[in-house]
Amino acid sequence: MKRRDFLLNTLPAAALLPEVINGYSVKAFDTNSPLVQALMRGTTLTDHVLVIVQLSGGNDGLNMVIPVADYSRYFNARSNVAIPEARVLPIAGVSGTGIHPSMTGLQSLFNEGKAKVIQAVGYPTPNFSHFRATDIWMSASNSTQEVYSGWAGRYLNYEYPNFPNGYPNTDMTDPLAIQIGSTTSLTTQGPSVNMGMSITNPTSFYNLVSGTTDPAPDTPAGKELKFIRQVNQQTQKYSTVIRAAANAVTQQATYPTNNSLADQLKIVARLVKGGLKTRVYMVSFGGFDTHSVQVNAADTTTGAHATLLQRVSDAIKAFQDDLKFLGVEERVIGMTYSEFGRRIKSNSSVGTDHGAAAPMFLFGSSVEAGMLGVNPTIPANASVNDNIPMQYDFRSIYSTILEKWFCLDKTIVESLFPPNINTQLQTLPLLKAGVCSGVTPPPPPDPADVIVTNYPNPFITSTTIKFKTEGGHTLIQIIDTLGRVLKVLVDRDYPTAGIYTVNFDAEGLAHGIYYARFQNGVTQQVRAMLKVR
């Protein structure tokens, strides 16, 4: 039996430590855990920490980040759930875009220069199943690929291929990644084994790691059992340092009550300040599958979704304030994500259905504050099939964090993503200059600078797309309203900057809206095109 199969078939994915902090069980992932390994290489260069906040269920990004500049189309598409324009909270330094009125905490972080929104994050040909879409986000695969390792886990496997032998050691005494809660994440799965294990009975866990079990037989299965016991012994050692770190912090800033996300983030702040060298923390918050009764009909600024967004906003604000109070905010950034967004058009049940691209938030004192991207394109008469077209591929968010926060060489970053992922990884302007090398990332394009156009528009069978490239690799994809990539018109390197044209032949395609997605370096734009009869 292979070690990987033995582990997967005999034990849950993560080992639950017999430690409880603030009422939450803490799961420590060892070095071979994907996300753990992605960050351990960074330990020789940086003491940076990443906090991943998973919003489970598929968050309605269009009601979270609201296109005020295109409010009439937004309202027409979802009048029964739309947020009144006068109630939308402005974002410091950003015009024409605001956030949900319940997110005053995040608005304060924008005002303090500690938050960034990235518009329309997704991937080509999205999947609308919760389980499959979550796997795609955690593994960084294509929608057509089955990848069984996590995006960060592959990096850690590259850094620490010999784990678990020799860990913990004098160079790294602490767990490399910690998930707060009771579930594990594919994000931390390595190519061969996920080093987190879940044991729900603390007594049996103690017996296993304290050596009170019978000797393992001299068989292949016995060797695997010895391996599991070795991991559990390491986990027990990690539980000691986690408890010591938690006990080292006796005072923290105030957190909101009745907020499970805030409870989790409070533990993270405590462990960071307490001295753990852990590089990645994972927390989760569910309830975002809002097919019905997303808002209160009498006041759309209230209701189920508003409550969720307020708790997320309040928790992140309290966490950031606590990091500042504890004197460690310069070491930590956070990232939110959900497995998909929602459709542009609301449904008759005062809710929204599974959709494609959606915004992400980054937060922390090292984040380049403001907004990356532009308001999503909303049709004048949106249908139930219309989705927000992708502007940024989520894998470019991951790769930028690995390169610019954990200071990994770009060529190594690229090697850690699955082959044929149908995207070119971009280095995006997410973080302030100097975090790793002092090299200032290229500024994002001025949204007013029109880079891609087409004529005629509307068109009957074909249209000519004109685009401006700065040289280098240039990509133009044709995407339908479901987010599927129908054609790739341009995928090549241009030796010099200039203006070029390419023909889009839509013969055989149904009439309706299509999007031309242009990507060149850090720049991308989406052009809506209408095919008529």
Predicted regions and their residues:
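Low-complexity, Pro/Thr/Ser/Gly/Ala-rich linker/spacer regions in secreted
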Residues: 433-446
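Feature for exported/extracytoplasmic and membrane-associated proteins, marking the mature portion
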Residues: 2-314, 318-326, 345, 365-436
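Beta-strand segments within the central parallel beta-sheet cores of soluble alpha/beta enzyme folds
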Residues: 282, 330-337
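Histidine-centered active-site microenvironments of extracellular/periplasmic hydrolases
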Residues: 338-369
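Short, glycine/acidic-enriched loop or turn micro-motifs at the edges of active sites
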Residues: 57, 292, 342, 460, ...
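C-terminal outer-membrane/trafficking sorting elements
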Residues: 445-455, 459-533
